[in-house]
Regions:
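GST-like domain detector, emphasizing the conserved glutathione-binding G-site
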Residues: 1-129, 140, 219-224
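Alpha-helical packing segments of well-folded alpha/beta enzyme cores
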Residues: 15, 126-130, 134, 160, ...
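Alpha-helical recognition domains of nuclear gene-regulatory proteins
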Residues: 18, 72, 133, 137, ...
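Residue-level recognition of oxygen-bearing side chains
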Residues: 68, 177, 190
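Hydrophobic/aromatic-lined pockets within catalytic cores
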Residues: 74, 78, 98, 139, ...
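Surface-exposed helix-capping loop/turn segments at secondary-structure junctions
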Residues: 79, 136-148, 189-195
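GST superfamily/GST-like fold recognition
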Residues: 90, 145-187, 195
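Acidic/histidine-enriched, glycine/proline-rich intrinsically disordered or flexible terminal extensions
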Residues: 198-224
Length: 224
């Protein structure tokens, strides 16, 4: 399989973690390398609905939209519940994890200087309301969101909490259950190895970059 996405810690991260957890081989490719173009806008027209990530399963089959890809992989990694009601609840929680993308992923992955400070200030303000329903689930069901078993929604929630913990851990000081959740999640098969080998993240708030094979590349939607 081939996973196509930007140089960015966002929608593709939970997908990568699921594939590592399920021991599913894949190749991660930037869109400009996969499509042979200089920037994302040059290849956007060739992508279903013009969005990434996409998962190339074989020469004839491509999936798009992160939620669809996650649900497809959940059936291969035993991270989708069998009970239909619980399955619907897991779907709903996964959909709500997308509320973290702009305040967390974009703030630390793309914003710089004054804009970064403004976005971080806003994140600090809205975070309690964003986290509360997830935290309630951890208190009711822990160590994961619905039980002692991780479902695919846990992978998405972990991604955002891990990024927040690494970039502004003080914002989670009042949420010990999230620390417990992250520590338990990192014990899942394949997760620790993935975290040790994924690109390192530097320059937060100034010049964000991700390290690939010793070379640090700016985050974003273009070749640099």
């Amino acid at each position: 399989m081939k996973l196509i996405y930007f140089n960015y810690l966002a929608y593709a991260e939970p997908i990568k973690m699921m594939m590592n957890h399920g021991n599913i081989p894949y190749e991660f490719i930037f869109p400009w390398d996969y499509f042979g173009t200089e920037k994302w806008s040059d290849s956007k027209k060739d992508v279903p609905f013009g969005k990434l990530p996409i998962l190339v399963i074989d020469e004839e089959t491509t999936l798009w939209e992160s939620g669809a890809i996650m649900r497809y992989l959940s059936r291969k990694t035993n991270t989708m519940p069998e009970d239909e009601i619980l399955k619907a609840k897991v779907d709903a929680v996964f959909d709500n994890t997308k509320d973290f993308v702009y305040p967390i992923d974009a703030t630390f992955g793309a914003r710089v200087d004054e804009e970064f400070q403004e976005c971080k200030k806003e994140l600090t303000s809205i975070l309690p309301d964003l986290i509360r329903p997830f935290y309630n689930l951890l208190e009711e069901n822990g160590p994961f969101l619905f039980s002692d078993k991780a479902f695919y929604c846990d992978f998405a929630f972990y991604h955002h909490m891990k990024l927040l913990k690494d970039c502004a851990g003080e914002l989670l000081d009042n949420y010990p259950k999230i620390t417990d959740f992250c520590e338990t999640f990192e014990k899942l098969r394949g997760i620790d190895d993935y975290l040790k080998n994924r690109p390192s993240f530097i320059g937060i708030g100034k010049d964000p970059k991700l390290g690939h094979e010793g070379q640090f590349l700016p985050t974003g939607y273009w070749r640099d």
